Amino acid sequence: MTNIQKTHPLMKIVNNAFIDLPTPSNISSWWNFGSLLGICLILQILTGLFLAMHYTADTTTAFSSVTHICRDVNYGWIIRYMHANGASMFFICLFMHVGRGLYYGSYAYTETWNIGVILLFATMATAFMGYVLPWGQMSFWGATVITNLLSAIPYIGTNLVEWIWGGFSVDKATLTRFFAFHFIFPFIIAALAMVHLLFLHETGSNNPTGISSDADKIPFHPYYTIKDILGALLLILALMILVLFSPDLLGDPDNYTPANPLNTPPHIKPEWYFLFAYAILRSIPNKLGGVLALVLSILILVLMPLLHTSKQRSMMFRPISQCLFWILVADLLTLTWIGGQPVEHPYIIIGQLASIMYFLLILVLMPMASTIENNLLKW
């Protein structure tokens, strides 16, 4: 009797990706974040779909419709807070996933890595547009400030901003198009995630040692399916603790005030997951320079395969690089803290030093450390 799992065109794809996939036997919990990101994406699409059923993308009713969801729709409050805090969990998983890739040299799979960077940009764009939809004070002013950054582009900047706004300020046209894009983007992300997996399965997974694991592979199911289920349960536990005990912990109180173009909030700041990039943007006194630094702070990931000078792929056996990696993590945490602080002494200088340190670590210190470690191997 033929096994449908291995003959049916659709089942064959599922089988080769999630069941009979040969997987390294030594991948740690840092390899769980890929599946967790998939779960986050599905959760966001489902909660988002139900929110879209009750939301109205109009400047006069957007804020009221979100209030209506929380007060009048059955379980609307939990759907709304799962969606808002689900985005935070999504970014926590994203940062862990990227960090894992940097530490263990997963960027050596250049196609997979580059698709991953595109996925990161797409997710950030989606989250930004989603933040505008409740049409609170921080939604409106966040949209105004961030879209305005494009006016720093020489010659076409101003026209570009007005084209995105659909007018001369952030208004109804902007909200409507942001809702349309926010709805479609997660499906584009899902398609890109499939391409990401397609490229990954061309080479197979990396592992903590960074050396070939062809000699020691195990089937994905049941070993890693059960491991992924454990990860998923912990993710959902963390999300539900956040949603049910302190749903507004990561939000901004200003967003509970309806958008008012005549009143600027004292401190305009994005959601916590953008603060590191926002701090880099603010540390440069020039507008165009700041925008370039902002884009480069994430685009720099594309250069990782080129900046890899070590003879070893993973950082597992490279103590100097390990030390620099954790300094980079601390630096990003510092930038995140600075991004949420007002623009005044001493925060300005701390932010500038942390921004310089960020680029210095990635572009200079880490490649140098790798070269030193290569030479130490000869002794």
Swiss-Prot record:
Pfam families: Cytochrom_B_C (PF00032), Cytochrome_B (PF00033). Heme b b562 binds at H83, H182. One of its GO terms (cellular component) is respiratory chain complex III. It is found in: Mitochondrion inner membrane. Disulfide bonds: none annotated. GO terms for molecular function: metal ion binding; ubiquinol-cytochrome-c reductase activity. Its cofactor is heme b. The chain crosses the membrane at residues 33-53, 77-98, 113-133, 178-198, 226-246, 288-308, 320-340, 347-367. Belongs to the cytochrome b family. Component of the ubiquinol-cytochrome c reductase complex (complex III or cytochrome b-c1 complex) that is part of the mitochondrial respiratory chain. The b-c1 complex mediates electron transfer from ubiquinol to cytochrome c. Contributes to the generation of a proton gradient across the mitochondrial membrane that is then used for ATP synthesis. This is Cytochrome b.
